[in-house]
Amino acid sequence: MMNYATIVTILLLLLSGQSVNSQESPPELTPVTPIAIEQGYLEGRGLTRVDPSEFDGENVTRDEDFTSDSYTHAFYTGKIFVAVYEAGPGRVYIDGALYDEFVHILEGRLILTPDSGDAVEFKQGESLVVPQGYKGYWYMPEKYRELIVINTDYAKAEGGP
């Protein structure tokens, strides 16, 4: 005859969806390891040229005088996207940023002029957050490089990874 503790254990296992006599081994756990942010990329070495069409559909319009190439290196893509981005002088208009973006300026200056206010300048070594929905100009008056962290929830909402 089973005792009360055995009956309760069996009921709990049944309610949790596990087999009482399960011979299944536990699922394999994928090891989680840190990802190094390599200094060379932060300094602009080894970056890959960006195809300008990658910005299609991101509510970004380049000014006609923005002809310089852009370069990048992605460190990580998951719930966040972490990358270095570099461009020459230029200005773009953002008509409603699709995602929250953390920016740390590695080289150059960034001048943001929101539709709703005055220009704000950020310099090398400074950090900022551009919230989802931002509308305004993004101006890089000289060679510019940044470390960015982007929330990738927007891509999932649009059927992305």
Model regions: which residues?
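Positively charged n-region of N-terminal signal peptides that target proteins for export
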Residues: 1-6
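Bacterial N-terminal signal peptides
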Residues: 7-16
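A short, N-terminal "cap"/entry segment at the start of jelly-roll beta-barrel domains
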Residues: 22-79
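Conserved short histidine dyad/triad with adjacent acidic residue
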Residues: 78-97, 132
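Short hydrophobic/aromatic-rich beta-strand segments that constitute the beta-sheet cores
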Residues: 82, 94, 112, 146-149
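Short, conserved beta-strand element in jelly-roll/cupin
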Residues: 97-112
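Short acidic-glycine-tyrosine-enriched beta hairpin
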Residues: 117-132
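Ligand-binding loop in jelly-roll beta-barrel domains
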Residues: 132-156
